[in-house]
Curated annotation (Swiss-Prot):
Function field: Voltage-dependent chloride (Cl) channel probably contributing to proton motive force (PMF) partitioning across the thylakoid membrane by anion influx into the lumen. Influences thylakoid ultrastructure, including lumen size and organization.
Protein name: Voltage-dependent chloride channel 2, chloroplastic
Pfam family, one: Bestrophin
Location relative to the cell: Plastid, Chloroplast thylakoid membrane
High-level lineage: Eukaryota, Viridiplantae, Streptophyta, Embryophyta, Tracheophyta
Organism: Arabidopsis thaliana (Mouse-ear cress)
Membrane-spanning residues: 111-131, 148-168, 316-336, 337-357
Gene Ontology molecular function terms on file: voltage-gated chloride channel activity
Catalysed reactions, semicolon-separated: chloride(in) = chloride(out)
Length: 410
């Protein structure tokens, strides 16, 4: 009644005759059939993972709470509008009370707030190491637990290297800030010169005046478009809605590169003016200055200080302060806690300033500079005819005084 069957498994076991007595009579003899077993990894240890995963996520989110809070404040401060200094600002800047004012404003400083996560971490490490060493010294731990101490000689040898690393890092960041500032000085001066040349070159009426007014609006819109291009979170539609017309603004908003789109508006408008080649060449030279400004700004935005240099500085600082309590234990004991706090606050503050000024455009008063360009252009247009008529009137008065019936008075 029983027929021999070969059960073929994916593990290549065959001719398992010891399974024959377990076969039921209702099973008919059929060709051997391979049995394939599928492994589902999600079914293995799913119970503990479902319990541990939310706990680990909560722990990670708790550890990230303070850094995220300080980073949020720092980024909001980065987007605040800067203002140009006036005479009153410089008097306050030179005041002998500036030190008291700077110290009293420390709780609201974004640099100080950004130091909370690293300084708190390394101070906590110093407390743990000091507590451990004290427990070993008081024989609260078994004898095989060593006291964490080391010679300060390696620190004395590497301290100048760390100092130079921080100095060069900050100097490199400041040089980038200077490049950004000089680039915007050229952009603003080039925009003002271009607007002045257009105002002084166009004397016609009708269509030429319409083209001139539109061209001046495009020129004024360029620094605004570039400012929105290099500063994160800028609203170009809001900034340009009162500068250029709606249809032109919609075309600029659709462009992938908005500053170059404004340059195209300026270039096409210049071609429609009836100007001689000399004036056209002068205007084109000023436009080249604006295009160079775009290139400098994009290089500063897209190419940071070499990341290997930034990472080296960060790693050096972290390793330095992780081992600082061990180095200072023999000389300071529990004073390693305030010593680590002061060292971390000082050195990480220098490094943080270098990181902040590495991206220079949020540090510049670009909104006020753009508003100044607009006001200068409007004032130049309004005063052009007044000044021109006044000079013509003076010329006529001089001609009347120096001539009588076509002859010069003796």
């Amino acid at each position: 009644m029983y027929q021999s069957m070969n059960l073929s498994f994916s593990s290549n076991f065959t001719n398992l005759s010891f399974l024959k007595p377990r076969l039921y009579s209702g099973i008919s003899a059929r060709a051997p059939k391979s049995l394939h077993f599928k492994f589902n990894p999600s079914c293995v240890s799913s119970g503990p993972k479902s319990d541990d995963s939310p706990l680990s996520e909560k722990l990670i989110s708790l550890l990230k709470a303070v850094p995220n809070w300080s980073d949020g404040i720092k980024e909001r401060r980065m987007q605040q509008k800067r203002s140009l200094y006036t005479h009153e600002n410089w008097v306050r800047h030179r005041s002998s009370l500036r030190h008291l004012r700077h110290v009293s404003s420390s709780p609201s400083s974004r640099v100080i707030l950004s130091l909370i996560p690293p300084v708190f971490f390394f101070t906590t490490v110093a407390i743990l190491i000091a507590g451990y060493n004290s427990a070993v010294d008081l024989d609260w731990l078994p004898d095989f637990f060593p006291v964490l101490r080391a010679s300060p000689l390696p620190y004395q040898l590497t301290a100048p290297a760390l100092a130079l690393l921080l100095v060069f890092r900050t100097e490199a960041s400041y040089s980038r800030f200077e490049q950004g500032r000089k680039a915007w000085v050229k952009i603003i001066s080039g925009t003002n010169d271009l607007a002045r040349l257009v105002i002084s070159s166009v004397h016609g009426s009708g269509d030429e005046l319409i083209i001139r007014d539109a061209l001046l609006r495009y020129i004024v819109a360029f620094p605004v478009a570039l400012k929105c291009h290099v500063i994160y979170g800028s609203d170009i539609a809001s900034d340009l809605k009162n500068v250029i017309e709606v249809d032109d603004l919609s075309l600029i908003l659709q462009s992938k590169h908005r500053p170059r789109c404004v340059i195209q508006f300026i270039s096409q408008s210049l071609q429609l003016l009836n100007l001689d080649s000399t004036k056209i060449d002068m205007l084109e030279t000023k436009m080249m200055q604006l295009q160079e400004g775009i290139g400098v700004c994009e290089q500063l935005m897209g190419i940071p200080i070499p990341l290997s240099y930034t990472r080296l500085t960060s790693r050096f600082l972290v390793l330095w302060h992780l081992t600082l309590p061990v180095i200072l234990w023999d000389d300071c004991h529990w004073n390693v806690v305030p010593a680590t706090f002061i060292s971390a606050a000082s050195l990480f503050c220098i490094e943080e300033v270098g990181v902040l000024i590495e991206e220079p455009f949020s540090m510049l008063a670009l909104d006020e500079l753009c508003a100044m360009v607009l006001s200068n252009s409007d004032e130049a247009v309004e005063s052009k005819e007044v000044i021109r008529n006044r000079i013509i009137a003076k010329k006529r008065i001089l001609e009347i005084k120096h001539s009588s019936n076509g002859w010069h008075k003796s």
